[in-house]
Structure formats: structure tokens, C-alpha cells
């Protein structure tokens, strides 16, 4: 309800969810997520997270890992264009890895071509689950896709402005142009999402989400348990 209220009170162009739509990839969890997103009455884009494929049901993990996700959300990689934003979804989940992210050369090329064809006046965003950079002191550093820097070197040349990701369940922002010394004019923000609505919180952090504006400003919103709203 608090997120629905926030969306109703603000000028939101789209909602994006960077994976972990479910806890254990159960059909009822996917259904609940779809019902919630539809209730916002806004365009939305999602990508799968490592929690969105079966963990213990090995037969399903091997042969139909994305069945539940695709049943409710369709293609694993979709795009969304709004008045000011051009958002590309990329699937970084592989059945052979538990938490580690992966992107292929084919995915790098596809995103690169999409960026080249994107309207020059729109803010260009990539949506993935695993981060493309994790500071050395943070848990999960090994989960970055192996080809992350190679991908960024390509995409940065064609106007990428930001990567939105989840996985670490903690809000943060980094500039990948500085981190990887990409030598492009624009900042390339890595915007890390916290846990939006799950009751399973990490390290006592409150539920949270981010907003990103056309000028690149990122704001973090945290749930106030007293006022029962995000602020």
C-alpha cells in the first residue's frame, strides 16, 4: 500500500524491478508479484534474479528454470521506453550458478546495437540483477559478471547513463566511469536497490527503493514504520 500511495502522489514514468521477485520461485509468489505490479497502473519492466529460479527442485532448475517467471512475465529480456527514459533489460541469471551473474558476448552485442539505435535525447538505462561493480568491502564481490568491464567499455561509447541492479539488498550509487576509468564524458551510474516489500530484510535495513531522475539524480526512500510510508 505504501508503494502504491507513493506512485499515486508522484509523477512516475515507469517502475523497474531488478530481480528477486520471489523467495523460492513458487507460482503463487510470481502471481502475487504480478498482481502487485499491475495494481500500480504504471508501465513496468522486470528481470529475473537468482531467487526466481528453483533452488532445491533440481529437475526444474535444470530443464525449466524460468518456467514460473515466463508464465507471468513473458520474455526474459524486454525493453521499455517512456517519455524520457530508454530502459533495456538483460538476464544475468544462469541455472549453473547459485548467485554469480553472467552475461554473454551475444548479450553485449545486442545491448550495444540497441543503444546505438536509441533516441539521443533519452536517458539510457540497463536493468540487470547482479551488479557490475561491488566495492571490495562488500559481500558478494564474486557475483559480478565476468565480462562486466568489457561490456561497459562497449556500452559507454554509445551513451549508456546508468545500470540499475539488485542482488545485494542495499541502496547505493557508484559512478562506473570513474571505477573502471572508461574515459567517457557522461557519468555511468550503478544504482543499487534495497529490498522493497519483502519481510525478509537484510542486516536490519528497512524496506527501501530508489527513484532516478532525468538529470541523473538518485534518491533513496526508506520505509518509516511509524508513519507507514516511504520517505
Q: What do the PLM-derived regions correspond to, one by one?
A:
Residues 213-231:
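A short C-terminal boundary segment appended to hydrolase-like catalytic domains
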Residues 1-32, 38:
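N-terminal active-site segment of His-dependent metallophosphoesterases
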Residues 23-28, 50-58, 95-98, 131-135, ...:
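Active-site environment of divalent metal-dependent phosphoester hydrolases
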